[in-house]
Amino acid sequence: LNSKGMLLIWSIHLRWLTWVATTSPHIHVFLSASSACSNIIPRSAWEARETHCPKMNLPAKYIVIIHTAGRTCIMSDECCLLVQDIQSLFIDRLNSCDIGYNFLVGQDGVIYEGVGWNVQGSRVPGYNDIALGIAFMGTFLGTPPNAAALEAAQNLIQCAEDKGYLIPNYLLVGHSDIVNTLSPGQALYNIIKAWPHFKH
């Protein structure tokens, strides 16, 4: 039971997700991953702090694959807490407007809304208004994310295409392709090189 009295019960599978959020009064919300867009946990579910940040210039021209570094998560309650911690890091220590990523990927195979589709992230200077940043939670220098996380990210990209958040001829790049950084980690980078639209 969290601080707002919301009980989050997650039943997660690679290709099927049911999310039941119970509040007082009793409200039930069910999300099924029958489409590429449905496996996204909204900011309200992980109790994001409210912010007002610059807007994206949509449709985006780039997908930037990032890793957050630090710890990862494999259970949904653990991932929600980790996303909270990452948001606090950005706001309180890095003086950012909000969490630096549009979306985050847990090793529970679930996508967590960061600033979402319409708001700029803050990790790719010069690209923040035209790129969607997808961050895998963890460090992936030697070991890549698991299959569930990789599939979730690919579904998210398909969702962005389906909903018109990406131009048809978008480019997919690693964080290290545009910033001097170890992100997204060599193990993850080796995988995304084989993804559609990759551009070194």
Q: PLM ranges: what are they?
A:
Residues 2-68, 106-122, 127-200:
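Basic/polar, cationic surfaces and motifs that engage anionic cell-wall
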Residues 37, 53, 73, 79-80, ...:
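Cysteine-centric signal of extracytoplasmic or virion-exposed proteins
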Residues 57-91:
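Active-site acidic/histidine clusters and adjacent loop/turn architecture
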Residues 86, 90-99, 107:
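Glycine-/small-residue-enriched capping loops at alpha/beta junctions
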